[in-house]
UniProtKB/Swiss-Prot annotation:
GO annotations of cellular component type: cytosol
CDD domains in alphabetical order: SHMT
Subunit architecture: Homodimer.
Cytoplasm recorded as keyword: yes
High-level lineage: Bacteria, Pseudomonadati, Pseudomonadota, Gammaproteobacteria, Alteromonadales
Gene Ontology BP term (one): tetrahydrofolate interconversion
Pathways involved: One-carbon metabolism; tetrahydrofolate interconversion; Amino-acid biosynthesis; glycine biosynthesis; glycine from L-serine: step 1/1
Name under which the protein is recorded: Serine hydroxymethyltransferase
EC category name: transferase
Length: 417
């Protein structure tokens, strides 16, 4: 018999302690992983609701099970809000993740062996854009494009490769690129060779929703995103389009269900609906503007302290610190900063001589620190501490000093105040 007062603390203290420790870690550590963020209590409330009990294979109004009248309302709210947020005429909110959304696009538009032009992972792309260890690199013929000497996307090279190899699909989007992407130029190239343009905007979706980064939806045939990262929603994915092509929309829906997934996670879709509503509020735009201001402030300090930033700056929420030529690997930098309660991730940089498990760079992003209230002053102060550690990464005294400063700053800016 189920009772409302059942709880994890009494029943499963081992699990409860792990959850409590993670909660404390998030409060006492500064989160700089560019793909991480803090979702709102409203989103978590939706995810912890009775919607988790309901199977709902199919789409609103076309379910395979009965009893779906209320989950239809939930999913329709999420769909309509996503369309409003990004100016789309089609939205699928069922993908469990960004990678599964991307997989559905491949399935809908391509056949195994088709040629795809995607951004090189070592130049800032994503695993699902053609990495040989991913389904995309195993099932399709991938032609990688990259960045030039200045760290910017080389559109002339992209066009040359497109004309030479005639891919059926071109992919825009990134996981570690700090510049503005010219979606219109990419569509011109795609149209020149008769290819689909597919954009994965996962990293910058929140910035796009707020109007502080160019929107790819008017230019691409299909756009995907995660719903966490800069969007600050639950972990999941979405597929969008403004192509006004009903046949394309049917293919995309079929590729998600039944092509790649079974029942949707209705409690997560409810969380997405909440997050989309939050992203439509005026304060969300102010938040995203501050995300970019904080990133630019951090870059300023890194450059002043003599550190190289790939592309020389940032126009979004992230930056890639290039440690090539320094007696410090990305892995060592990651570990040293982690010991001071600063969480980053090691990351390959262009022309990296080290393996992806070691790397010569670290990726840093500002969505999470901005979410807890940091502004430029705190971002600059924090970057100074990071540089202190990178300058002397094997000095325990420096790490302990910075850790104390981090704890004091975290206490001033609680995640959930």
């Amino acid at each position: 018999m189920l009772k409302k007062d059942m709880n994890i603390a009494d029943y499963d203290p081992e699990l409860f302690n792990a959850i409590q420790n993670e909660t404390l870690r998030q409060e006492e550590h500064i989160e700089l992983i560019a793909s991480e963020n803090y979702t709102s209590p409203r989103v978590m409330q939706a995810q912890g609701s009775q919607l988790t009990n309901k199977y709902a294979e199919g789409y609103p109004g076309k379910r395979y099970y009965g009893g779906c009248e209320y989950v239809d309302v939930v999913e329709t709210l999420a769909i309509e809000r996503a369309k409003q947020l990004f100016g789309a005429t089609y939205a699928n909110v069922q993908p469990h993740s960004g990678s599964q959304a991307n997989s559905a696009v491949y399935m809908a538009l391509l056949k195994p062996g088709d040629t795809v032009l995607g951004m090189n992972l070592a130049h800032g792309g994503h695993l699902t854009h053609g990495s040989p260890v991913n389904f995309s690199g195993r099932l399709y013929n991938i032609i990688p494009y990259g960045i030039d000497e200045s760290g910017k996307i080389d559109y002339d090279e992209m066009e040359r490769l497109a004309v030479e190899h005639k891919p059926k699909m071109m992919i825009g989007g990134f996981s570690a690129y700090s510049g503005i992407v010219d979606w219109a130029r990419m569509r011109e190239i795609a149209d020149k060779i008769g290819a689909y343009l597919f954009v994965d905007m996962a990293h910058v979706a929140g910035l796009i929703a707020a109007g502080v980064y160019p929107n790819p939806v008017p230019h691409a045939h299909v756009v995907t995103s995660t719903t966490h990262k800069t969007l600050a929603g639950p972990r999941g994915g979405i597929i969008l389009s403004a192509a006004d092509d009903e046949e394309l929309y049917k293919k995309l829906n079929s590729a998600v269900f039944p092509g790649g997934q079974g029942g949707p996670l209705m409690h997560v879709i409810a969380g997405k609906a909440v997050a989309f509503k939050e992203a439509l509020e005026p304060e969300f735009k102010a938040y995203q503007q501050q995300v970019v201001k904080n990133a630019k402030a951090m870059v300023e300090v890194f450059l002043e302290r003599g550190y190289k930033i790939v592309s020389g700056g940032t126009d979004n929420h992230l930056m890639l610190v290039d440690l090539i030529g320094r007696d410090l690997t990305g892995k060592e930098a990651d570990a040293a900063l982690g010991s001071a309660n600063i969480t980053v991730n090691k990351n390959s940089v262009p022309n990296d001589p080290r393996s992806p498990f070691v790397t010569s760079g670290v990726r840093i992003g500002t969505p999470a620190i901005t979410r807890r209230g940091f502004k430029e002053a705190e971002a600059k102060e924090l970057t100074g501490w990071i540089c202190d550690i990178l300058d002397d990464a094997h000095n325990p005294a420096v790490i302990e000093r910075v850790k104390g400063q981090v704890l004091a700053l975290c206490a001033r800016f609680p995640v959930y105040g």
